[in-house]
């Protein structure tokens, strides 16, 4: 796994531990995922805030988390001084609830709003959770207004998330929205072959 180069306990404690295998190099590109891949790759090539937020959506197993992980890896390697956090929406909610219970919401707000890049996986998780949505909305606005980068993934486009507040949907859809198209047979076989080759490399002889 890849460790964060920025020694900030807050970031270390909430960020998903990056998987070095989920890199751009190991992502199998085809016609169905070319747009999400290109947008994600561009995000790391000195193109921060060229579109903000970047919102990637598609069905389960299409490679959304792989791309977010790959973005985080590239940013930490190319821009180690950026305060980058990659976390699930569930984890964001958990941190927010914990801050409320410990009467420490000011610290929570300050920590999240001091980030340079916030990467959130599965934003649909906060659907129907009004207080978490409201806090995320304010965090989102604050970061965008500062010119910081936000990258989001979901199983649906922002406008198809029924349990999400309308103003949050509007903000999520205000940047670049890219989706995964259904995979064809050729891409599925290429992905399978890639995984088989990785397994072979992992088996000691």
Whereabouts are the PLM-identified features?
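Pre-Walker A (pre-P-loop) alpha-helix and adjacent loop at the N terminus of AAA/AAA+ ATPase modules
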Residues: 14-54, 73
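Walker A/P-loop nucleotide-binding motif
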Residues: 48-69
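Short glycine-rich substrate-engagement loop in P-loop NTPases that contacts/grips substrate
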Residues: 76, 81-117, 127-130
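Structural recognition of the conserved hydrophobic beta-strand(s) that form the central parallel beta-sheet
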Residues: 86-87, 119-121, 149-155
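Short regulatory helix/loop adjacent to the ATP-binding pocket of P-loop NTPases
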Residues: 97-101, 156-174
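Conserved catalytic/switch belt of AAA+ P-loop NTPases
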Residues: 128, 133-156, 166-171
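Conserved AAA+ ATPase "SRH/arginine-finger" region at the nucleotide-binding site
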Residues: 160-162, 175-187
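Conserved C-terminal "switch" segment of AAA+ ATPases
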Residues: 182-205
């Amino acid at each position: 796994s890849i460790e964060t180069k920025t020694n900030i306990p807050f970031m270390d404690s909430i960020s998903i531990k990056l998987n070095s295998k989920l890199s751009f190099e190991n992502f199998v590109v085809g016609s169905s995922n070319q747009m999400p891949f290109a947008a994600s790759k561009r995000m790391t090539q000195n193109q921060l805030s060229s579109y903000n937020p970047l919102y990637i959506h598609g069905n389960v197993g299409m490679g959304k988390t792989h791309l977010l992980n790959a973005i985080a890896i590239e940013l930490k390697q190319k821009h180690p001084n950026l305060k980058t956090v990659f976390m699930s929406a569930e984890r964001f909610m958990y941190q927010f609830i914990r801050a409320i219970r410990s009467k420490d919401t000011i610290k929570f707000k300050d920590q999240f709003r001091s980030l340079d890049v916030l990467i959130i996986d599965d934003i649909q998780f906060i659907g129907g959770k009004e207080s978490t949505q409201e806090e995320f909305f304010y965090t989102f606005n604050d970061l965008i207004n500062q010119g910081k980068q936000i990258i989001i993934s979901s199983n649906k486009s922002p406008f198809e998330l029924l349990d999400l507040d309308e103003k949050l949907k509007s903000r999520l859809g205000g940047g670049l929205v890219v989706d995964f198209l259904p995979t064809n047979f050729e891409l599925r076989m290429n992905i399978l072959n890639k995984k088989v080759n990785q397994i072979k490399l992992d088996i000691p002889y």
